[in-house]
Amino acid sequence: MCGRRGGIWLALAAALLHVSLQGEFQRRLYKELVKNYNPLERPVANDSQPLTVYFSLSLLQIMDVDEKNQVLTTNIWLQMSWTDHYLQWNMSEYPGVKNVRFPDGQIWKPDILLYNSADERFDATFHTNVLVNASGHCQYLPPGIFKSSCYIDVRWFPFDVQQCKLKFGSWSYGGWSLDLQMQEADISSYIPNGEWDLMGIPGKRNEKFYECCKEPYPDVTYTVTMRRRTLYYGLNLLIPCVLISALALLVFLLPADSGEKISLGITVLLSLTVFMLLVAEIMPATSDSVPLIAQYFASTMIIVGLSVVVTVIVLRYHHHDPDGGKMPKWTRIILLNWCAWFLRMKRPGEDKVRPACQHKPRRCSLASVELSAGAGPPTSNGNLLYIGFRGLEGMHCAPTPDSGVVCGRLACSPTHDEHLMHGTHPSDGDPDLAKILEEVRYIANRFRCQDESEVICSEWKFAACVVDRLCLMAFSVFTIICTIGILMSAPNFVEAVSKDFA
C-alpha cells in the first residue's frame, strides 16, 4: 500500500517538473531571441540581399459602397509572411516550444500599407501578435476595416459593374530591400452582400520606377470586381418610372371637356422630378458620365413635357372661338384629310349628312303665303308664325368647298329670293304679314349663323381629336423605344434581369 502511494507521488512530481521545465524553456527562449535584437534592423543574413515578403488577403465582407463620396468599405484580413534570420532556434534545445508570439513593435515587420486609403487614420489595421516558428518563419495576420478610394463609374447605373482597386505596398522599402510577392486572395469566408454580388478579386504584382531612385518599388494590387443587384432599384425606381410614363399617355385619352388634361400632365412631370431628385442624392456630383437611369428619367420628362405642350394646342383647338375665323386650308388638308385617313377616324355624323338635292325644293313665293293666309283672318300670332315657318320648308343643307357643310340656305329660285329680300309681294296692303316675314328672315339668318358656327367649332374639335390620337400613337411608340433602347443598352442588362428578377 505504501509502495503504491509512493509511486503516485513520484508521477505527480515528474509531471510538475515537466511543466516547470516547459515554462522555463519558453522563458529562456524569449530571452535569447530578444537579446541584442534590434526591431529597426532588416532581418537578413546578407544586407545586400532583399528580404522576400509574401502578401495576400482574405476578403470577409463588402460593408458599404459610397457612390457619392466614392469610398469602398471592406472587412479584410491581411496575410504577410517572411523569414527572420535572427528568430531561429534548435527545437532539441527547447523541447516542446514549437512557436512563439511577439507583440507589435518588439520585432521587425514590413511596413505594408494600403496606398489608396481613405481612412482618417490611414492605417486601419489592428496590430496583432507575430507568430514565429523554429525556422524563423514569421506570420502576421492583422485584420482591419479598410476604407479605400474607388472611382465609381455610374454610367450604367443601376446595371453597373464596379471595379475597386486595393493597392498595397511598402511605405519606406524599395524593391532592392524588400521583395514583395503576391499570393491569391482568399474569399472562402466571404459574407454575401445584399446590394452587391462579388464576381472576383484578381491580383497583380506591379513595379513602379520613380525619378528619384533607380530601384523599383513593387506593389500588389487586388481588384474587387462586383456587380450591383438591381432588384431594389428596379422595384423602387424603374418600375414606378415606367408606370408614371404610361400615365403620361393617358393625357391624350382624357376628354378635353374634363378640364384635367393639363393638371394630369403637370402632376406626372412633378412625380418624375421627385424620382430624379432621389437618384441625384445617391449619385456622385460628376460630369464624366450621365447615369443610365438619369438618361431614362430625362427622356421620360421630355416626353411628358412635350405632351403638356401638345395638350395646350389640343385645348386651343377644342375651345376655338368660331369668330376667330375658319380653319386654314393647309391645316384642314393635313389634319382632317391625311391624318384622319391614316388614323381611320371619321367626323361625327359624317355618314348621316343628307345629300344636297335629296328632296325637291319648293318654290317659296308670297303668293303661296297669301293663299295660306287667305284661309282665315290673321287673328293669332301663332297662326301667323306657323304660316311663316311653313314658307321655310324649302331649306336644306348643301356642302361648300371651303368649310365642309353649311346649313340653312333657302332652296329658292333667284327671282323669288330677290323678291322676298326686297320685300316685294302682292299683299302690300297687309303690314302685319310684312312684319311677320321680317321676323322670319331674322330668325332664319340667326339659325344660319348658328349652324355655320357649329360647323366651324366641330371642325376644330375634330382636329383636336385627330391631334390627340396622333400624339397618343407617336408618344406610345417613342416611350417604348426609349424604355427598351436605353435600359437594354447596359452591357449586363440580360444577366442582371435573369439573376435578380428570376
From Swiss-Prot:
Q: List the disulfide bonds.
A: 150-164, 212-213
The known PTMs are summarized as:
Glycosylations at Asn-46, Asn-90 and Asn-133 are essential for TMEM35A/NACHO-mediated proper subunit assembly and trafficking to the cell membrane.
**Key words of the record:** Calcium, Cell membrane, Disulfide bond, Glycoprotein, Ion channel, Ion transport, Ligand-gated ion channel, Membrane, Metal-binding, Postsynaptic cell membrane, Receptor, Signal, Synapse, Transmembrane, Transmembrane helix, Transport
Q: What result is annotated for mutating residue 133 to A?
A: Impairs TMEM35A/NACHO-mediated proper subunit assembly and trafficking to cell membrane
Q: Which residues lie on this side of the membrane: Cytoplasmic?
A: 316-469
**Essential for TMEM35A/NACHO-mediated proper subunit assembly and trafficking to cell membrane, as annotated region:** 260-267
- Tissue specificity remark: Higly expressed in brain. ALso expressed in immune cells sucha as macrophages.
Instruction: Report the InterPro entries cross-referenced here.
Output: Neur_chan_lig-bd (IPR006202), Neur_chan_lig-bd_sf (IPR036734), Neur_channel (IPR006201), Neuro-gated_channel_TM_sf (IPR036719), Neuro_actylchol_rec (IPR038050), Neurotrans-gated_channel_TM (IPR006029), Neurotransmitter_ion_chnl_CS (IPR018000), Nicotinic_acetylcholine_rcpt (IPR002394)
Give the bilayer topology. Multi-pass membrane protein
Tell me if Nucleotide-binding is a UniProt keyword of this record: no
Q: Which residues bind Ca(2+)?
A: 42, 44, 172, 210
Return the similarity comment: Belongs to the ligand-gated ion channel (TC 1.A.9) family. Acetylcholine receptor (TC 1.A.9.1) subfamily. Alpha-7/CHRNA7 sub-subfamily.
- The protein depicted here goes by the name Neuronal acetylcholine receptor subunit alpha-7
Lineage, highest ranks first:
Eukaryota, Metazoa, Chordata, Craniata, Vertebrata
Give the gene symbol: Chrna7
